């Protein structure tokens, strides 16, 4: 996407295809607030100031299995470094649906670990208090296991926090989080180290 108008058009298109705010935010790698702003702006309603956000388009990586493989190797290298520093191991790599899945499955293979899939609650337009995401039963279990969480982008950190809390409630031990891009700029979330290939820091 080259400009705001492209983002607005894509947000409207995704909404017309039935995606809700959280799913659109995940697809465009922006916050829910930015999606709301884009959709409001598309209707030419009262102009609100643009949220401070950055859109990340990593489709040139995502469309190539070869590129995904090499990126997953780089993420594995960072995770192994973190595990060595913290004297921890990995039993399960947890991919956050949907964009964390391809990287997580390749990383699990490389690390000789099981693969688990996490469905976040952010895909729902209205999230009720106490509502949680889920670990898919079709993949590896996490109870009592050392886990590495993999996603594409950290925007606010809320999804990462959700996954960490859910894993802990299930008796798992989150040991590290690996992402392509960290827009939050955090070293840790809930005492779990964050490792990213790219960290974005706003100077305003």
Curated annotation (Swiss-Prot):
Transmembrane segments: none annotated. InterPro entries: GfcR-like (IPR022854), PRibTrfase_dom (IPR000836), PRTase-like (IPR029057). GO terms for molecular function: DNA binding; orotate phosphoribosyltransferase activity. Coiled coil: none annotated. Keywords: DNA-binding, Transcription, Transcription regulation. GO terms for biological process: pyrimidine nucleobase biosynthetic process; regulation of gene expression; UMP biosynthetic process. PANTHER family: OROTATE PHOSPHORIBOSYLTRANSFERASE (PTHR19278), PYRE-LIKE PROTEIN (PTHR19278:SF41). Contains an N-terminal DNA-binding winged helix-turn-helix domain and a C-terminal regulatory domain (or effector binding domain) resembling phosphoribosyltransferase (PRT) domain. Belongs to the purine/pyrimidine phosphoribosyltransferase family. GfcR subfamily. This is Transcriptional regulator GfcR 1.
């Amino acid at each position: 996407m080259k400009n705001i108008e492209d983002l607005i058009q894509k947000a409207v298109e995704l909404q017309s295809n039935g995606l809700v705010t959280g799913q659109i935010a995940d697809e465009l790698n922006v916050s829910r607030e930015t999606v709301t702003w884009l959709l409001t702006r598309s209707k030419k309603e009262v102009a609100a100031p643009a949220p401070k956000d950055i859109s990340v388009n990593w489709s040139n990586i995502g469309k190539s299995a070869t590129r995904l493989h090499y990126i997953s190797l780089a993420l594995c290298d960072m995770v192994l470094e973190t595990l060595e520093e913290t004297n921890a191991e990995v039993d399960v790599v947890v991919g956050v649906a949907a964009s964390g899945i391809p990287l997580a499955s390749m990383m699990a293979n490389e690390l000789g670990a099981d693969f688990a899939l996490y469905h976040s609650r952010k895909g729902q337009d209205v999230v009720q208090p106490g509502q949680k995401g889920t670990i898919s039963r079709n993949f590896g279990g996490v109870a009592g296991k050392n886990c590495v969480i993999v996603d594409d982008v950290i925007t606010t950190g809320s999804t990462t926090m959700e996954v960490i809390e859910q894993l802990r409630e299930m008796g798992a031990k989150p040991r590290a989080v690996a992402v392509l891009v960290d827009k939050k700029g955090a070293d840790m979330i809930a005492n779990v180290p964050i490792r990213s290939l790219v960290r974005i820091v706003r100077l305003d």
